Amino acid sequence: MILNDRKIRELIESKELLIDPLDAVQIQPSSVDLRLGNDFLIYPEDIEILDVRNPDLHNQLKKVVADDEGFIIQPKQFILATTREYIKLPDYLTAFVEGRSSLGRLGLFIENAGWVDAGFEGNITLEFYNANSRPLKIYPGMRICQLVFAKMEEPAENPYRGKYQGQRGTTASRIFLDKD
């Protein structure tokens, strides 16, 4: 069941669902608008191969902190970004992230794993790709995506406690921690 605005507000007021910071205008009829944080990770062009088994790969990324002047994503550039909001989902609630159509119409693809598991806690790292042939300027604090919540029939037996639990800010891939 997708949660409506009334139920989202109830869960926030009861502190079962945490979204911080949150302004009441971010709550939409069936979602919550999330805003862009101000730190970005960029893959330098001198990295020849992104080796998923390289535990040092994340240290090779360039961190950029944007101010009110904004951040420019070059054509065909891939970067990592984050939401300003820190979220904490209860064990019976899952969510998925949807990019804003208005940004998609400018060529900005906003991706992530798409699904936020029950029990997750942290900022949400977003993957951006500028598919346009022109640079695109974005600004910290702007609405960047929507979080849609779904209540599960029962709480998760094993809620999320994975490698991204508690992440703060833009977080690089931790695939090297996978056991398979």
Swiss-Prot record:
Give EC number(s), comma-separated: 3.5.4.30
User: So what does this thing catalyse?
Assistant: dCTP + 2 H2O = dUMP + NH4(+) + diphosphate
- Give GO terms for biological process: dUMP biosynthetic process; dUTP biosynthetic process; nucleobase-containing small molecule interconversion
**A Pfam short name:** DCD
Q: Give site residues, Important for bifunctional activity.
A: 114-115
Q: Key word Nucleotide-binding present in the record?
A: yes
What terms describe the molecular function in GO for this protein? dCTP deaminase (dUMP-forming) activity; dCTP deaminase activity; nucleotide binding
InterPro entries, per database record? dCTP_deaminase (IPR011962), dUTPase-like_sf (IPR036157), dUTPase_trimeric (IPR033704)
Q: Where does dCTP bind?
A: 100-105, 117, 125-127, 146, 160, 167
What is the active site of this protein?
Answer: 127 (proton donor/acceptor)
Please verify whether the record's keywords include Nucleotide-binding. Answer: yes
Subunit info?
A: Homotrimer.
- Recorded protein name is dCTP deaminase, dUMP-forming
